[in-house]
Amino acid sequence: MNTNTRLHHAKPFGVVVLLVVAILFSAASRAAGAPTVPDTLQQRIIVCTTCHGMHGEGTPGSGYFPRLAGKPAAYLVRQMQNFQNGLRKYAPMEYTVRQLSLAYMQEIAEYFAAQQVPYSRSPLPPVSAATLQRGEQLVSKGDPARKIPACASCHGSQLTGVQPSTPGLVGLPYDYLSAQLGSWRTHTRGTVAPDCMAVVANRLSASDITAVAAALASRQLPADTHAQAAGSVTPPLPCGVLGATGDGT
């Protein structure tokens, strides 16, 4: 699993670095005498949309750059903060957000949270029916004997997320889901303590991670893909990002 996780991060790394360098070089060229570009939010977040899509829809076929559109704004802000403070490791993102103010991160997050664009589907890996069945069990019911809660117990009954801080899982690519679960196991992704996702990920086996990622990536989208209302779920584990009340406050 550790090898796969490193590969998942290594493949897009060089591409992202080249894109960031190209964008910065282009900005310097414009400053040197090219026509002035309007200073709009859309122009300033081009470094985001280059990988995550013009409206945060993700990058179909890549498997590595997740959808941002419609995610709770507080969740998106928290992820940028985690890249800033080292709780989440991915060099291109760490570089991109390193000097952003909290107010600017909130502005970016609110922009992407407000985007409502169609979902795209990424290719699925060849997995057995038994693997998909195991994944569906973990997603919907968990594994009480191993103290593994269901994904739905935190991410909502339709896995569309819960306001204000829990992201949706539907529509995410298999490669991204697998890589993130692996990152929690290898401590390259973390968040405010107590880190409930790190606890859950470390109770999953490598085969469980394959099963969960495959089951989530193959799920049909619900009719309503909006995040559930705050307070509509009771988390089964203490989660620092959800605060004392379990709803982010």
What residue ranges belong to the model's regions?
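N-terminal secretory signal peptides that target proteins for export/translocation
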Residues: 1-11
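Gly/Gly-Pro-rich "capping" loops immediately C-terminal to redox-active cysteine motifs
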Residues: 38-42, 56-85, 94-100, 152, ...
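C-terminal capping alpha-helices of c-type cytochrome domains
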Residues: 98-122, 134, 200-235
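Residue-level hotspots at or immediately adjacent to binding/recognition sites across diverse folds
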Residues: 54, 96, 193-196, 210-211
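Bacterial N-terminal signal peptides
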Residues: 14-26
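Electrostatic cytochrome c docking/interface patches
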Residues: 26-45, 55-64, 114-144, 243-244, ...
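Acidic (E/D-rich), amphipathic helical modules within compact regulatory domains
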Residues: 62-67, 73, 77-136
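The canonical Cys-X-X-Cys-His
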Residues: 46-54, 108, 148-158, 212
